[in-house]
Curated annotation (Swiss-Prot):
Its EC number is 3.6.1.27. It comes from Halalkalibacterium halodurans (strain ATCC BAA-125 / DSM 18197 / FERM 7344 / JCM 9153 / C-125) (Bacillus halodurans). This is Undecaprenyl-diphosphatase 1. Disulfide bonds: none annotated. It is found in: Cell membrane. Bacitracin is thought to be involved in the inhibition of peptidoglycan synthesis by sequestering undecaprenyl diphosphate, thereby reducing the pool of lipid carrier available. The gene is uppP1. One of its GO terms (biological process) is peptidoglycan biosynthetic process. It is an enzyme of class 3 (hydrolase). Belongs to the UppP family. It catalyses: di-trans,octa-cis-undecaprenyl diphosphate + H2O = di-trans,octa-cis-undecaprenyl phosphate + phosphate + H(+). It comes from the Bacteria.
Length: 274
């Protein structure tokens, strides 16, 4: 009996890792879906460390896919800072904008963390947030501006960073909010997508570092390190595949698919609550 329970525990965390990993890159709100999954399927997640682990897995998947672009950005920024190399000025500017755009979400998370945890993880809030995400995606479904990396302004970066704070609400997609804001400002789809996922790196890394003390003190981390590791691997693979798929969807201008899904998910949740 004990071995079957242990097997189910491993399967559960693998499925949770795959689920979170697949929903993280696409504009459907992975945090909102995780809350819905726990409520409607009665799945309990033991410990505080799980979400941090699977988010780190998604972070590594993003870095793996954009590794050459990121390496260019880091090298160019370093050349500009160390040697005042004019060729690296554009890379340094984008790096600065990414850090600046991270600030609003970090401040909002620090100021309103407890309120978000207690008040916003309500099912009706998530349902309405999904409907809003769907509407935002629908509004920009045909947009494809002309702004590339060299055309991004300080104001653009701040506005996209402010949009990212909306994703603190479960049901509002982080990638969706930032891509909608960027494309609304006239960015090209490819530029908006890349900046959105570059912006995911500091916010995810920062939240993970801040949570290290919680992980160390979490008694479940030691007891569940094998299931957590399996969830990490599953989340990495699912995030990698999901992001590549999302990039292909964006190239073909099919954001409407995600808008329809968010509407459907939001309406189903509301109907189940009524």
């Amino acid at each position: 009996m004990e071995w079957s329970q242990e097997l189910w525990l491993l399967i559960k965390y693998l499925l949770l890792g795959l689920f979170q990993g697949f929903t993280e890159p696409i504009p459907v709100s992975s945090s909102g879906h995780l809350v819905l999954l726990q409520h409607f399927l009665g799945i309990e997640i033991e410990g505080l460390s799980f979400e941090v682990m699977v988010n780190f897995a998604s972070l590594f998947a993003v870095i793996a896919i954009y590794r050459f672009d990121l390496l260019k950005l880091v090298k160019g920024s370093a050349r500009y800072v160390l040697y005042q190399d004019a060729q690296g000025k554009g890379d340094f500017r984008i790096s600065f904008y990414l850090l600046l755009a991270t600030v609003p979400a970090v401040l909002a998370a620090l100021l309103f963390k407890d309120w978000i945890e207690t008040e916003l993880k309500q099912l009706h809030v998530i349902a309405f947030a999904l409907l809003i995400t769907g509407m935002a995606l629908w509004l920009i479904r045909h947009l494809n501006g002309r702004k590339q990396d060299g055309d991004i302004t300080l104001k653009d970066a701040l506005l996209v960073g402010l949009a990212q704070t909306a994703a603190l609400i479960p049901g509002i997609s982080r990638s969706g909010a930032t891509i909608v804001a960027a494309m609304g400002l006239g960015w090209r789809q490819e530029t908006a997508l890349r900046f959105s996922f570059f912006l995911y790196i500091p916010i995810s890394l920062g939240s993970g570092v801040l949570a290290i003390s919680d992980i160390v003190q979490d008694p479940h981390f030691t007891a569940l390190w094998i299931p957590y590791t399996i969830a990490f691997i599953g989340s990495f693979i699912a995030s990698y595949v999901s992001l590549l798929w999302f990039m292909n969807i964006m190239r073909h201008g099919k954001l409407i698919y995600f808008a329809l899904y968010c509407w459907l998910a939001g309406l189903i949740v509301l109907s189940l609550l009524s």
